Structures are given as C-alpha cells and as structure tokens.
Amino acid sequence: ERNDDHLDGAVYSMHVQGGFYLDDFVAQGGVSNDTDLIQFITDNITHGVVDLNMTAPEIGCSSFTATAENGDALFARNYDFSKTNAMLVFTDANEGRHASISTVDLQFLGIDVDQDMTGLMDKVICLAAPYAPLDGVNDAGVSCGIYMTYQGGEETVATSQDTDKPDFTSTTLLRLILDYADNVEEAVEIASSYDLHDSANTSYHYMVADASGKSAILEWTNDSAVDTTDNDGSQRTLKVVY
C-alpha cells in the first residue's frame, strides 16, 4: 500500500509462468545495449502493444552477507531510493533453469513512481520485468544483487567490453545467474563467459552468495587506471573478490 507521506511507493508481485523466452535470448548471444533488449522484449513478449524504455535512477545501495546463529547463510540488501514502485517477480523452474524470486525497480521500466499501477498498459510493460532484476535468490540458494559504481571520474562511464564473447547487459546478466547458477563459482563462470555492457549509461558491480555462505564481489575495472582515469569501458575486465 502506498504511503505518500512517508515517500514510499507501492509494492507489487507477479508470477511468471513459462520461460519468458530466456533460452532464445541466450541462444541469440544476448544483446549489447538497452535498445536491442527492448527490441527483443517487443518482438517476443509485448509485441508492440506499448512503448518500452529503460532508465536507471541515481542510487547508492549496499549489501552484506552473514551467517545466522542457526547456521543459515543470509544475504541482505537495501535500496537507497527516495521513492519507488517495486515488484517481486516469481519465476518457475524450466528445463535446467532455477525458480527464483527477484526484485525489480519499476522506474527502470518507465512506470511513474508517483502513481499506483492500475491501467492495462502498465501491466503489459511489467511483462518485461524478468529482464530487469536488481537482485534475487534462486531455489539453489544463490543470491545476487547489482549496485552502481560510478566509475570514470566526473562523468560515469559504462562498462562496454569488446571481445569475441556473447554480449549481455547489466540486469540480463543477473537474470542468467539466477536462472542457471548452482553456486558462487558457477555465477563467476557465467559472468566470465560474456562481454558486459552496462545499462543506462552508468556502471555497476555485483555481489553474489550461495547456500554454503560463500560470497564474492564481481567488478569490471581497468588494471592500468585509477578511479578518475577509468574512462574506457571497453578496457575493463572482470575481477572477483572472495
């Protein structure tokens, strides 16, 4: 329920049955930018009924992992949003893919943060939500979140690798990890198998953890640059910190 006095948006949930064409997305080698991602979603899911756009609000999120007294592995994450509409997206297991629960910031899909989502067109837009997770957990106990890094000095420069690997964008890489990874090492293997192209002209890194309590930070940096000179997103490579 919305509480405008407290600057809270609304929270929605959606259960996605079926594969939402992710296997086809992987088979085509992903995409290298948000425009091509929107085109894939339009061609396969929304079929041009609505106009899609993807933007990223300015955020400064944080996470931690911990072990509870009973031995459970915990993954915590906050969103430093002033206000947003959020959606919990439930997806089913499909032919070698895990079931998962993920969180989507509906601002990213162009949903008005100051309005409740009541119209049919807003609901059609939300069919794109499985491709825009900011964090989530799958049924193997793998959790993953995405966070802005603001790399590049005065102006943020997006990571945009340029090798012969297939291409994936920020949120679609997180979707791959949720659907296909059994543990942290498999998440790292997935991330290292693709060229990353950050979405919305900004830069990101990831935290991933699994049911054993193991965790890692995945970040893309230029070995020869410092924060203020890391201005060439094509020269960044994946670094993993356990």
What is the predicted role of each segment?
Residues 94, 192, 206-210:
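A sequence-level detector of short, solvent-exposed, charge-rich linear segments
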Residues 189, 193-194, 202:
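Extracellular-facing segments of soluble proteins and assemblies that are Gly/Ser/Thr-biased and enriched
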Residues 201-242:
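Extended amphipathic alpha-helical segments with heptad-repeat/coiled-coil character used for oligomerization
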Residues 1-185, 196-200:
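N-terminal mature-domain region immediately after signal-peptide cleavage
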Residues 80, 192, 213:
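Residue-level marker of positions within ordered structural domains that often coincide
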